[in-house]
Amino acid sequence: MLDDADIHPLFHNAPGTTEFKKLRKRIIRNVREAIDLYGMVEREAREGTKPRWLVCLSGGKDSYTLLAALTELQWRGLLPVEILACNLDQGQPGFPATVLPEFLERMGVPHRIEYQDTYSIVMDKVPAGRTYCALCSRLRRGNLYRIAREEGCSAVLLGHHRDDILETFFMNLFHGGRLATMPPKLVNEEGDLFVLRPLAHVAEADCARFAKALDYPIIPCDLCGSQDGLQRQQVKALLDGWEANSPGRRQVMFKALTNIRPSHMLDPNLFDFAGLGLADAFSENPK
């Protein structure tokens, strides 16, 4: 099905190799799986009314992969939503402002490009030597929510992949003292927008190979001169080491996030240990 000649312009540069065809099918399959498993398509779509999704496009490999996968599914009638790509130009020095609008126009993708100088705010508020990422992210998120409302979108879609989710889990474990990560679907604090991560089951390495193979115009993520905090770098290095020593370890750890047994943890808010009876211990369906 994915090898038809009738393809979206986003795939016009697709290599004809067996390796790329397998990569493409795997990514599309993983995205469909996440959309279905986590109920990302709203009830309105299932009843015949198309919701509108704001797909955030930074110009990095992950957001290009997200846009291409969603557009592929929509193109083939497998995703009953309207897609609006959105790039928020935050005023970072050296940001190539024409790259994304020209690319999206050429690809025929509906889009909105907005300039908001959050960079100056971040530079003014964050002390020298500290990472800018947290404040920058909050300001970006607020603007994206506003744009989604203005465009009549019901959901904001982000390009976080499987490895982002794993790294966040371990950062919360090591530094926050809690078991939590980025969920594939949540409702914002105001209660009026979904936040969706359809790449939740996609490996970062697959995103990198995919975007490179299609020769998408990648924009560096460190134009502001800041990098992710040291904690995330350390966690990423740790996961890389585990994966090198035991190939497939990342996928096993990710599977654990989908296979939680509250009765075998220690949180009384999730499992009623005090009310546990002897008969419950031999239940065929332990919680």
Curated annotation (Swiss-Prot):
GO biological process: tRNA thio-modification
Enzyme class: transferase
GO molecular function, one term: sulfurtransferase activity
Positions occupied by motif PP-loop motif: 58-63
Catalysed reactions listed for this entry: cytidine(32) in tRNA + S-sulfanyl-L-cysteinyl-[cysteine desulfurase] + AH2 + ATP = 2-thiocytidine(32) in tRNA + L-cysteinyl-[cysteine desulfurase] + A + AMP + diphosphate + H(+)
Gene Ontology CC annotations of this record: cytoplasm
Compartment annotation: Cytoplasm
Top-level taxonomic group: Bacteria
Required cofactor names: Mg(2+); [4Fe-4S] cluster
UniProt keywords, alphabetically: 4Fe-4S, ATP-binding, Cytoplasm, Iron, Iron-sulfur, Magnesium, Metal-binding, Nucleotide-binding, RNA-binding, Transferase, tRNA processing, tRNA-binding
Principal location: cytoplasm
Note on how the cofactor is bound: Binds 1 [4Fe-4S] cluster per subunit. The cluster is chelated by three Cys residues, the fourth Fe has a free coordination site that may bind a sulfur atom transferred from the persulfide of IscS.
Matches recorded under Pfam families: ATP_bind_3
Pathway this chain belongs to: tRNA modification
UniProt function note: Catalyzes the ATP-dependent 2-thiolation of cytidine in position 32 of tRNA, to form 2-thiocytidine (s(2)C32). The sulfur atoms are provided by the cysteine/cysteine desulfurase (IscS) system.
UniProt-listed PANTHER family: AMINOTRAN_5 DOMAIN-CONTAINING PROTEIN (PTHR43686:SF1), SULFURTRANSFERASE-RELATED (PTHR43686)
Family named by the database record: Belongs to the TtcA family.
Quaternary context: Homodimer.
Protein name: tRNA-cytidine(32) 2-sulfurtransferase
Name of the encoding gene: ttcA
